[in-house]
């Protein structure tokens, strides 16, 4: 059993790298424990984290861009099982049914779309309703806003704020 701990938030890049290596080694989802760093529990027998370090060159997976984007949004959800669900769906797309995402009655696909929808809604609310207040900090203008997202959606909207407010000093707390 492989245990992989994702330490970054939301963890897409780290998850993608670990998933590529595990898919290349054909490790089925039921033989992997994917968890976030803040949900790590001590193993009863103390076996530490293992990485899927592949001895052979990484295979070039060809996954539809729409599937990758769906996984990226779902990985921003706050559900602790998001990494395992996304790996299970990726495994099924690669080894079982390349058109899995079009199967709207599949339980994993339903859950994946629901998670992505919740994250998109959260990200939309941030860009639509977030309001900055001007403060003076060391004699300079600074704009501060407070937002508490339900999911890890802040990274998805950083580009929006950087381009919209590129000439301002701002912070989102």
Predicted region positions:
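Extended, well-folded catalytic/binding cores that form a central cleft or groove in large enzyme
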Residues: 1-173
């Amino acid at each position: 059993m492989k245990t992989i701990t994702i330490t970054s938030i939301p963890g897409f890049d780290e998850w993608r790298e670990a998933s590529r290596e595990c898919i290349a080694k054909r490790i089925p989802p039921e033989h992997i424990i994917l968890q976030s760093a803040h949900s790590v529990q001590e193993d009863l027998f103390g076996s530490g984290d293992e990485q899927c370090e592949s001895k052979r060159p990484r295979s070039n997976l060809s996954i539809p861009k729409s599937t990758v984007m769906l996984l990226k949004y779902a990985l921003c959800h706050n559900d602790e099982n998001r990494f395992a669900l996304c790996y299970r769906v990726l495994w099924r797309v690669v080894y079982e049914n390349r058109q899995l995402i079009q199967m709207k009655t599949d339980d994993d696909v339903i859950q994946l779309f629901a998670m992505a929808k919740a994250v998109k809604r959260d990200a939309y609310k941030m860009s639509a309703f977030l309001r900055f207040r001007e403060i003076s900090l060391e004699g300079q203008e600074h704009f501060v806003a407070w937002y508490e997202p339900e999911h890890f959606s802040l990274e998805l909207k950083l580009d929006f704020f950087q381009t919209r407010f590129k000439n301002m000093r701002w912070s989102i707390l």
